[in-house]
Amino acid sequence: MKEQATTKNVKKAAATKKTTVSKKAAESSKATATKKSTATKKTTASPKKAAAPKTAGQKTVVAKDKNDLMKLIKAAIKKNGTNCDLNFIDVSKVTDMSNLFHRSQFNGDISKWDVSNVKDMSFMFAVSQFNGNISQWNVSKVEDMGCMFQASRFDGDISQWNVSKAKDMTSMFAGTHFNGDVSRWNVSNVDDMSSMFSFSQFNGDVSQWNVSNVKNMSKMFCQSKFNRDLSQWNVSNVKDMSGMFAVSQFNGNISRWNVSNVGDMSFMFRKSQFNGDISKWKVSKDIDMSRMFEESPLADNPPKWYKE
């Protein structure tokens, strides 16, 4: 009997121990589940909103005049390099931009500049590396564009420019690779086009240009590749055509030109390809014709009115 009681007590103790272990296991499992649930909640919780990245752009700075503008440009290039964005400068008060980037390495962004009050852009990009986008510029008040792109790398789109107020286009594209579309330009107020395309790659259409107010066409296409139609040009007010087509490839029809007011035709076709008919030109008595056809196809058979 004692043995049976002992056996029952052992089984009872074992059962109690098993129950205790099971409870602990259950509690442990519950705790683990709670931890996992908490971890899951933390994981699935909405992340905190990331802060927007700060921009490196500068606040708009107003340039009071040309000198102020030049200082701002110099400081910006020194800080950010020659390809920097200068659109943060408000240039709407500036009226003179002559020589602004003359001999400069600058080739950054000035596409959004408001140049609507500028009157002088002479030498602005002369001998510079600039070839940026200025297609949307409002140049309607600019009067002087002399040497604006002379010997520069510029070859951008300026086909939509309103140049109706321009008077001086001397050497504007001289020595450049520019060959863009300027066919629709209103050049009716220009009086000086001397050397405008000299030493250039230009061979665009300018057949419809109104050049009736131009007085100086000296060296206009000298040493250029130009050979397009100029037959309809009204050159009745031109006084100087010296060297106009010298050393050029021009050989178009200019037989009906009214050159009665021209006083200087010296070197006009010297070393050029020109071999057209200009026999009906009416030239003034006191005109300078020195070396007009020298080393050209017409040298041996010049017009009858020609006098060395």
Q: What is the predicted function of each stretch?
A:
Residues 2-13, 17-30, 35-36, 40-308:
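Negatively charged
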